[in-house]
From Swiss-Prot:
Recorded GO CC terms: chromosome, centromeric region; chromosome, subtelomeric region; cytoplasm; kinetochore; meiotic spindle; mitotic spindle; nucleus; pericentric heterochromatin
Modified residues (Phosphoserine): 7, 240, 332, 335
Recorded coiled-coil stretches: 28-87, 125-145
A biological process term (GO) from this entry: mitotic sister chromatid biorientation
Family stated for the protein in its record: Belongs to the shugoshin family.
Source organism (scientific name): Schizosaccharomyces pombe (strain 972 / ATCC 24843) (Fission yeast)
Biased composition annotated in UniProt, kind: Low complexity: 200-210
Function: Involved in chromosome cohesion during mitosis and meiosis by preventing premature dissociation of cohesin complex from centromeres after prophase, when most of cohesin complex dissociates from chromosomes arms. Required for faithful mitotic chromosome segregation and proper kinetochore orientation during meiosis I. In contrast to sgo1, it is dispensable for centromeric protection of rec8 during meiosis I as well as protection of rad21 during mitosis. Required to sense the lack of tension at centromeres during mitosis.
Ranges of Basic and acidic residues composition bias in the record: 528-541, 593-602
Start-end of Polar residues biased regions: 242-253, 282-293, 375-396, 462-478, 621-647
Gene: sgo2
Name this polypeptide is given: Shugoshin-2
Amino acid sequence: MSKASLSPNVEDLKKKQIRQYKEIIRISKAQSIRIKELQLENERLLSENIDLRTTAINLEEQLETVQNENEENKTKLAALLNRFHEETDNFLSKLSLCQQEIQDTFKPVEANLAYDVDTDSEDLDEESVVKDTEEIIEQAQHDVSLRNLSGIEDENIIDDGETAINEQKKREANVFSDTQSAPQLKSGKALPADFENPYNLSNSKPVNNNNEDRVEAVTSENKSIDSAPQEKNHEYEIVSPKSLSNKINNQAAAQRRTEEDNANGVAQEENEGSQEAHFHSRIQSDTVIQSTPTKRKWDVDIQNKQINLASAATNVTGYVSETDSRPNRANSLDSAVLLVQSSNKSNRNGHHISDPNLNSSISLKFAPEDTAHNSLTSQENVGPQVTTTSLSNMTVAESPRTDTPREINGLVDSSVTNGNEKFSVEIMNDSNKIGLNPKSFTDEEREILTLFRNPPMRLSSEPPSSNGFSIAHPNNSPLRPPSLQGILNAEDRPYEIEPSRSSFATNDTGSYNNLELLSSVTNLKSPNENDRVTKTQSRRETKVKRRRKARIQETSEESTVVNEPNEKPDGRSRRERKKVNYALPGLRTKLRRNFDLPSDHVKAKKTRRAPKNSENDSATKTETANITSEAPTTSEVTLENSETLNL
């Protein structure tokens, strides 16, 4: 009974618990649903909050912008008000001024006249004195400036008073009122009769006749100018000091130009006849120019030098002839010919030179080094005395007649003949570095150059040339510096550069023995030995090492002595030899086997020594092999075990 009574109670309890669990599950589901709803509501509220915040922020920004606009409008209004007040004040002030002007204009005239008449007589006297003194000072300053600028000192200005001042103004106006003097001088027309020439301008025009006709024309024109009547009752303008100085400078420049034009025209027209007679033996062109790849310092301004040379020759001989005026005539000066026609009949001043001792043989020398620009100095002497004309970097020397050409240090070859009256300068062709002529050297210079050609023998301690090629000369002379080849080999043919040979080929005579000395110190092999010896030696070494592995220690030592004939017993250990060899520079390379050293510096691999009781070891090996062959395999053991389990 007890068991039957207990069983329903347990079942009831189980049912109650199941009900409670179901209720709890239902409540939890409802709560979870409620929680989800609350979460959704919370999210919605958060989103609304965010929207409200953004709108609030936008409203605040708008409010700030509106406030700023209001402030700007206030400032603008204040500025407009201030401007309006200022304009109103100005308008009122103008109105007041207009009222005052109207009142002033309608005042009676008698009051003004009375005010003007009421002046003190003493004040009038003082003002007149001051004005008079100022006028006197201004007039004096004007007179002094005119006298200083014109350069004319006239005593009548001080003595005669107003008449002298009028005459001075008249002269200045005659000189500077019209600029007709320069064109009249150039064209050769006669000057006006009232023109005065205080600066002694040359009024002569170029004349085609002799010097006497030219002088007569000049004197006749001067007489006509001086004899012309002068008008005195003209009115002249007062010229300022600045314009006066400018006119004076222009007049002086015009005077210089006219004088130069007249002189050049007279010289050209006087020498026209002699020019046609002496130009039949002329060379094709005045200057023959050959371009070179290199330019020296004195080749840069050669055109100016040629022009200056021509002007210098005119001072010595009288005339320069030039026909070729092309722009590219003076690009370089490696070889050039300058022809200067000289005339002994008349010089620039019209004087005749009839001395037979004076010839036109002229030598020219160009100095390549940079010298100071010397002024043009010309000296003309009659007789065998040499006259020189130096211009910048050039020297023109006049010497007596010589039939043979002159050579100045191999630079210039000049030849002039008196019959043709020709001045020619030939600059030698620059075929080598500097264009020196070997025939022009003196004995001392040739001795020095022979030393350069055949230098003393090289000592045995000097290293050979490290170039990849050797230079062979027909005379078997030693190597020369390349900068002197153009000077030393002007007569001989140039060097023949052979294809590259080894630097040892030049040392066949044994004069240089440093390589043998180095090989004796470092036990180097001679370079003439073949590489096959080194290969065979290395093969022998490898064979010896293989044999050492299979031999006993005693027999291996004997084999190393027998199979290495290059090894020399010098009583040193291998470590000592290694230290000596590695101490020398340049031995830690891949070509170490090329050295004539014993092979002991190569570290040999360690050989495994064979055991002394080799027979016992072989017996043990055979026993172990038999044991392994008799032992069953693992597969057989597993099969036996499975059979026993089944049983």
